[in-house]
């Protein structure tokens, strides 16, 4: 499908017409009413490692403010609540509240191994969070969240050929102040977020913030000798920051930690109706018969120091961080009970669809040891001269162990009966530079260059083959030492048509280091994906309209990724393998708009179109393994839509869209505020839409997620000049239910989206 061609001028006029009609009419008939209508605040972003007005940055950036985060987090949701809230962003997880996977413009990674890498970088308070155990840190007491689309390979330290999610927490200040935000909702969920800022002296200030999120179990398992209740969690996080500031020096010191206990994602056997992507008849959220155990724990911590020395015309930055984590997740991957191969009755059955569990699959994966250390030194100009520059060096070191376990579901206590282990030591260093030059007051050009050197030292071994005696049938050890170097660059230009409107263009390259898939618990080999390289071209506009009561940004883009790293399943084995596609291409556009449409009404609209395609006629994969069990039960398995590959049991994926990459994503909010009595009533509704997408590399009727529209509603009343507020909220207010992910090696096992939640909030500021 060709990408629609729409000019920036037409887009600006269309959005302006759609949003501020009432305001424009009021201006024409009553100019004096103009002073009664507030204006949109300027958006300041730091994606260029400088604090700049959004209109002056030649990047496609969306910013999410702290007020919006309060709304999305109301019901205790985790980082996945940001999915679809800005254009071209998708976030999902097969592990629940941990191990989120990010996709920008369709580029992401579906790998569920705990050593997986991702093409979307996550930067939390200027520190790269590389491991999957670090990426899901709770989002609380934030100043701002930014999504930087497209390759960010010159200024940010690790794999980011698709983009960067940048989280910036609120920093210590000079006033004694704070807040407490308490929410209570369905399933006895509690969401408590609090922060206090304390000035300690003329030079020192401190900010302490924390969050507690908990929920009772909402899913019951009626079978004995297994986990009885699931989907509950207890998630706690704390952040302590101390800021020291004198003339010529600033030091920001941070300690943060997370402690999570709960259950992993509930995999539900045979809930996809064969021949469709519908839920089976008789599906129930609260009913989950399984013969396995389910638990999940995560502890992580970070100590960091961000230092700045100011000199004549320049500043030196040092960012030092040490991260560590321990993670464990166990679940019943087959999603049901019994085993046809074992002669044990299997299920559950649903009306019109008999269950099939060929074999049990109860596994666990853990990270008993993770140590990440990073260091960045950055020297950059601090003048108002036409030429601005940045020079820096970066170092990354990660030491990681990944354990994989298998369990016997049919022995008393479900004892362990399999084990494999991976070790990895990853090191990377880079030098980088960036310049920004004002050719004229209206035309500014930027250029960046980065050299990166990556090395990994990896080993994996299976010391206990499932179903056999330990240390008898040892497989491995396997060793790998991939390494690569890369030059990344970008060129950009920003031209101000006037004070309200700017045009920008950017060409950029991105790079992801080689990846290793060493999940050898069910396989006898490891796989290595070569480094991937992306080239992206984009252009757009940013405009403030109608006396700064409306704002719109628009971007058109096209990218190509060579040697794209993909994760392929292994048929009827609970195993992944890494492959490189010769090429993948994507193109589309994004629109981000906000407007004050009347004195008491505000609205936002985000829209993105992403057309992605794998281009490799020689690439083929094994599709759903459950289709191979026809001898156990006729008509089982999925209906594959791709053409057969060159080998029996394979299909070609040439021309397929990238997995988990919806073509259309849009979001819309409408906010009404009015004074009542001595306070203010606020009503806010927000809606997010995702188009259909393939769950895997291949296409199958059952494994194509439906398009989804989910909405939220919040009604609040604040008084005492905003010091106090009470509110009621609901998320997924239509209770839309559908399969959003699946397990394809055993049966038609699915993962379902979160059901409707609701509750009340009370917030106090001081």
PLM ranges: what are they?
Residues 390, 445, 558-560, 580-697, ...:
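Gram-negative outer-membrane beta-barrel transporters
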Residues 1-75, 80-85, 197, 251, ...:
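N-terminal Sec signal peptide and the immediately downstream disordered periplasmic leader
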Residues 304-333, 494-496, 502-512, 530-608, ...:
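Membrane-embedded beta-barrel scaffold of Gram-negative outer-membrane proteins
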Residues 100, 117-119, 131, 140-149, ...:
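Outer-membrane beta-barrel translocator/receptor signature
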Residues 687-697, 717-766:
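C-terminal beta-signal and adjacent terminal beta-strands/loops
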Residues 227, 231-389, 396-398, 551-553:
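Outer-membrane beta-barrel domain signature, strongest for Gram-negative TonB-dependent receptors
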Residues 243-245, 379-382, 394-396, 422-559, ...:
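Structural signature of Gram-negative outer-membrane beta-barrels, strongest in the C-terminal barrel
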Residues 39-175, 539:
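Acidic, small-polar-rich N-terminal luminal/periplasmic segments of exported/outer-membrane proteins
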């Amino acid at each position: 499908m060709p990408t629609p061609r729409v000019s920036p001028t037409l887009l600006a006029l269309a959005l302006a017409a759609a949003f501020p009609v009432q305001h424009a009419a009021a201006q024409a008939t009553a100019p004096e009413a103009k002073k009664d209508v507030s204006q949109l605040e300027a958006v300041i972003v730091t994606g260029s490692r400088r604090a700049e007005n959004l209109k002056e940055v030649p990047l496609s950036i969306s910013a999410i403010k702290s007020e919006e985060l309060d709304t999305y987090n109301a019901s205790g949701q985790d980082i996945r609540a940001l999915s679809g809230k800005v254009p071209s962003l998708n976030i999902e997880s097969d592990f629940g509240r941990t191990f989120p996977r990010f996709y920008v413009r369709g580029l992401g990674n579906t790998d569920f191994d705990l050593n997986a890498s991702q093409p979307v970088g996550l930067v939390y308070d200027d520190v790269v969070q590389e491991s999957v155990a670090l990426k899901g840190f709770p989002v609380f007491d934030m100043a701002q969240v930014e999504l930087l689309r497209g390759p960010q390979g010159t200024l940010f330290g690790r794999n980011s050929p698709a983009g960067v999610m940048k989280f910036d927490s609120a920093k210590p200040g000079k006033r004694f102040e704070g807040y407490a935000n308490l929410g209570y909702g369905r399933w006895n969920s509690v969401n408590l977020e609090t922060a206090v800022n304390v000035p300690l002296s003329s030079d020192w200030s401190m900010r302490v913030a924390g969050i507690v999120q908990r929920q009772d179990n909402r899913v019951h398992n009626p079978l004995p000798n297994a986990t009885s209740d699931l989907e509950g969690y207890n998630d706690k996080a704390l952040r302590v920051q101390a800021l020291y500031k004198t003339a010529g020096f600033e030091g920001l010191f941070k300690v943060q930690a997370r402690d999570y206990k709960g259950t992993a994602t509930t995999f539900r056997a045979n809930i996809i109706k064969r021949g469709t992507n519908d839920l089976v008849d008789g599906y129930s959220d609260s009913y989950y018969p399984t013969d396995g155990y389910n638990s999940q724990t995560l502890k992580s911590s970070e100590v960091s120091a961000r230092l700045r020395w100011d000199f004549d015309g320049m500043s030196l930055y040092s960012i030092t961080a040490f991260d560590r984590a321990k993670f464990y997740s166990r679940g019943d991957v087959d999603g049901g009970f019994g085993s046809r191969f074992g002669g044990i009755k299997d299920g559950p059955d649903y009306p019109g669809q008999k269950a099939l569990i060929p074999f049990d699959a109860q596994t666990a994966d853990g990270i008993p040891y993770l140590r990440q250390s990073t260091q960045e030194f950055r020297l950059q100009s601090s003048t108002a001269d036409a030429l601005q520059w940045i020079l820096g060096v970066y170092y990354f070191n990660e030491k990681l162990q990944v354990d994989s376990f298998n369990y016997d579901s049919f022995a008393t206590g479900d004892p362990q009966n399999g084990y494999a282990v991976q070790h990895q030591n990853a090191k990377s260093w880079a030098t980088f530079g960036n310049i920004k030059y004002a050719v004229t007051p209206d035309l500014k050009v930027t250029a960046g260059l980065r050299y990166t050197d990556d090395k990994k030292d990896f080993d994996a071994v299976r010391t206990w083959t499932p179903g056999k005696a330990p240390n008898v049938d040892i497989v491995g050890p396997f060793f790998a030492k991939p390494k690569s170097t890369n030059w990344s660059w970008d060129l950009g230009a920003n031209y101000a048509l006037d004070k309200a409107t700017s045009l920008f263009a950017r060409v950029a390259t991105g790079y992801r280091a080689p990846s290793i898939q060493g999940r050898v618990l069910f396989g006898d080999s490891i796989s290595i994906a070569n480094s991937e390289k992306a080239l992206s071209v984009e252009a757009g506009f940013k405009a403030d309209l109608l006396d700064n009561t409306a704002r719109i940004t628009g971007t058109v883009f096209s990218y190509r990724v060579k040697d794209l790293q993909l994760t392929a399943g292994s048929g009827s084995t609970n195993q992944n393998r890494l492959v490189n596609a010769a090429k993948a291409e994507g193109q589309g556009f994004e629109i981000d708009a906000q407007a004050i449409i009347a004195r008491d009404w505000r609205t936002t609209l985000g829209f993105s179109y992403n057309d992605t395609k794998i281009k490799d006629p020689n690439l083929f994969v094994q599709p759903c393994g459950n289709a191979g069990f026809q001898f156990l039960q006729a008509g089982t398995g999925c209906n594959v839509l791709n053409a057969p590959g060159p080998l029996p049991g394979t299909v070609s994926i040439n021309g397929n869209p990238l997995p988990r990459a919806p073509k259309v994503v849009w979001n819309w909010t409408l906010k009404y505020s009015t004074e009542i009595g001595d306070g203010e009533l606020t009503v806010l509704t927000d809606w997010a839409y995702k188009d259909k997408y393939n769950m895997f590399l291949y296409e199958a009727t059952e494994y194509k997620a439906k398009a989804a529209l989910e909405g939220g509603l919040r009604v609040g009343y604040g008084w005492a000049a905003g010091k106090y507020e009470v509110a009621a909220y609901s998320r997924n207010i239509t209770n839309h239910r559908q399969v959003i992910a699946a397990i394809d090696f055993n049966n038609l096992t699915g993962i379902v989206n979160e059901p409707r939640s609701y509750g009340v909030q009370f917030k106090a500021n001081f």
